[in-house]
């Protein structure tokens, strides 16, 4: 049976994870993780990075296999498509468009918005239900659906608050970090040389900007989740040989059957406009 693989220094170097920011932008709390400077750019000590990645891989594995947890990936920058793809591939959840204040601290409102998204999709997919609407009204509903999908599509099936957060840039997505700390949700995060490692539970010192770096982090995290799912299936007597190894979705479906994941409660009679305003207000209050 497969085991968690350790990342090599060579892999980290190839992904450019050792490159930090300009020395003038550094956070002194990152000093223990900095190897030195090159052309006024801090170089990260990859021994610490490799060690912490091993720790984090075990944390992710345990969160899925032993706790049946929900992991939320967060990155609202240009890497969003990479992060979303890896999160989907391992059956987890993501916020990659924009973090709306209250996504963790105002979960009731988030649940209502997700319910509204479900209702709109069902209505727009049924010709009989939209037959009495004008083209302008239908276009308005489509736009609302698209906006809700961008904001909540990655968490619509999460069924509750996440039990673990993975953040790629704690400076950009500082509101997500602040909310997770308030809700006592453990945080795994990439901490570049301009970041504060004390803000998260499991800091991984490394480049948080390069696409190659983000792709490697996501692959490592996704592999840990998929390995946990593989072991869950094996422990439940599922014939892994009968499941297509090239199709993670098939294993995810089988895993959900044995863990009996419960969907979130649906809330009716909502005003999504008011709910969006609540999230915006929470965003300002943080």
Predicted regions and their residues:
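Long, charge-dense
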Residues: 84-141
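Short, ordered loop/turn segments at secondary-structure junctions
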Residues: 17, 48, 76-79, 92, ...
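Residue-level signature of catalytic and energy-coupling elements of molecular machines
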Residues: 16, 73, 165, 217
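Hydrophobic/aromatic ligand-binding patch that stacks against planar heteroaromatic rings
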Residues: 62, 85-86, 178-179
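Extended, charged alpha-helical interaction scaffolds
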Residues: 129-167, 171-188, 192
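Short glycine/threonine-rich loop/turn motifs
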Residues: 175-234, 238
């Amino acid at each position: 049976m497969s085991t968690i693989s350790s990342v090599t220094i060579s892999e980290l170097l190839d992904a450019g994870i050792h490159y930090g920011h300009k020395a003038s932008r550094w956070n002194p709390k990152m000093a223990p993780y900095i190897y030195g400077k090159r052309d006024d750019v801090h170089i990260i000590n990859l021994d610490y990075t490799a060690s912490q990645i091993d720790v984090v891989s075990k944390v992710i594995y345990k969160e899925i296999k032993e706790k049946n947890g929900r992991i939320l990936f967060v990155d609202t920058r240009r890497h969003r498509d990479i992060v979303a793809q890896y999160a989907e591939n391992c059956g987890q959840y993501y916020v990659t468009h924009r973090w709306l204040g209250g996504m963790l601290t105002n979960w009731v409102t988030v649940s209502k918005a997700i319910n509204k998204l479900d209702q709109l999709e069902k209505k727009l997919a049924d010709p009989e239900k939209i037959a009495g609407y004008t083209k302008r009204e239908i276009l308005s509903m489509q736009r609302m659906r698209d906006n809700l999908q961008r904001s909540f599509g990655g968490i619509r099936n999460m069924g509750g608050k996440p039990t673990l957060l993975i953040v790629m840039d704690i400076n950009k997505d500082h509101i997500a970090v602040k909310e997770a700390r308030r809700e006592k949700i453990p945080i795994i995060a990439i901490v570049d040389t301009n970041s504060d490692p004390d803000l998260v539970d499991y800091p991984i010192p490394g480049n948080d900007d390069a696409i190659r770096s983000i792709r490697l982090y996501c692959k490592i995290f996704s592999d840990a989740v998929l390995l946990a799912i593989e072991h869950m299936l094996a422990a439940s007597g599922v014939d892994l040989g009968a499941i297509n190894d090239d199709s993670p979705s098939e294993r995810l479906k089988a895993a959900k059957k044995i863990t009996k994941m419960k969907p979130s409660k649906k809330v009716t009679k909502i005003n999504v406009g008011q709910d969006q305003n609540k999230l915006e207000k929470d965003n300002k209050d943080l």
